[in-house]
């Protein structure tokens, strides 16, 4: 925050990457040593295709159309995202972000992403504030923290963001903390949301105009 206030945007990006990336990389090293680190870096340099992993995700297309798994499949394909294991796909350790998109119902445009960042901040039990910080800085202050999306300004709607934060906090599990989602993928999406305690996405309110 001090770096942002001083308009040291490069240092702010470095600090953010060190805080989030360092934690994720540390977990990969502790759990899988060099293999875990390789899995994290391979997609960044567009190498390391894992056909078995990719095939497992591609098979979600055969699930019922009302299922959690089919919704995840559609989320990837409709946005032209590569699955984990496909060339250019993100590491599986990061899939909790896309699982959150599906469960929350937030889109991948800037308005949806800042709400998804708040939803994520709610369900992440360890340092979740950093995801809210990311969303506000990336999609409201116009400081680019990730190479995946361009920066935007003016997307902080306090009502939407606080609602998203509350919805994430209501989730019974931390999707980022070794959550085994595979047994839930064949189930209806609405049932999964209910079991996890994710409140329904309220439609945007329309101001009442006096006659």
Task: Report residues per predicted region.
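Intrinsically disordered, low-complexity regions
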Residues: 22-23, 86, 198
């Amino acid at each position: 925050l001090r770096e942002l206030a001083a308009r040291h945007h490069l240092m702010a990006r470095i600090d953010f990457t060190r805080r989030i990336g360092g934690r994720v990389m540390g977990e990969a090293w502790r759990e899988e040593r060099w293999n875990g680190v390789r899995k994290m870096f391979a997609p960044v340099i567009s190498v390391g295709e894992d056909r078995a992993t990719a095939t497992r995700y591609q098979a979600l297309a055969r699930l019922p159309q009302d299922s959690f798994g089919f919704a995840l499949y559609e989320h990837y394909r409709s946005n032209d995202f590569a699955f984990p294991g496909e060339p250019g796909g993100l590491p599986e350790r990061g899939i909790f972000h896309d699982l959150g998109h599906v469960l929350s119902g937030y889109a991948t445009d800037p308005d949806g992403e800042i709400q998804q960042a708040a939803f994520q901040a709610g369900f992440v039990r360890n340092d979740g504030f950093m995801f809210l910080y990311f969303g506000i800085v990336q999609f409201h202050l116009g400081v680019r923290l990730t190479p995946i999306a361009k920066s935007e300004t003016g997307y902080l709607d306090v009502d939407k963001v606080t609602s998203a934060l509350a919805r994430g906090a209501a989730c019974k599990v931390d999707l980022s903390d070794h959550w085994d989602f595979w047994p839930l993928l064949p189930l209806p999406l609405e049932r999964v949301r209910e079991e996890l305690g994710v409140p329904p996405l309220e439609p945007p309110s329309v101001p009442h105009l006096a006659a």
